[in-house]
UniProtKB/Swiss-Prot annotation:
GO terms for molecular function: structural constituent of ribosome. Keywords: Ribonucleoprotein, Ribosomal protein. GO terms for cellular component: large ribosomal subunit. GO terms for biological process: translation. InterPro entries: Ribosomal_bL32, Ribosomal_bL32_bact, Ribosomal_zn-bd. Belongs to the bacterial ribosomal protein bL32 family. This is Large ribosomal subunit protein bL32. Residues 1-34 are annotated as: Disordered. The keyword Ribonucleoprotein applies. The lineage of its organism: Bacteria, Pseudomonadati, Pseudomonadota, Alphaproteobacteria, Maricaulales.
Amino acid sequence: MAVPKRKTTPSKRGMRRAHDALSSPVYIEDKDSGELRRPHHVDLKSGMYRGRQILEPKDD
């Protein structure tokens, strides 16, 4: 069974955990509609992606 030879210091533990934080999702303003949407994702209201119609727009 593997056992640590030395105690991990709080500094080393913190450096290891430095990349574990969760980041909030990024939103951009759509050029055509002005709505917020995720980058590199289809705009669900208009159904457009990169200037092309991908989905049928929602009629609410």
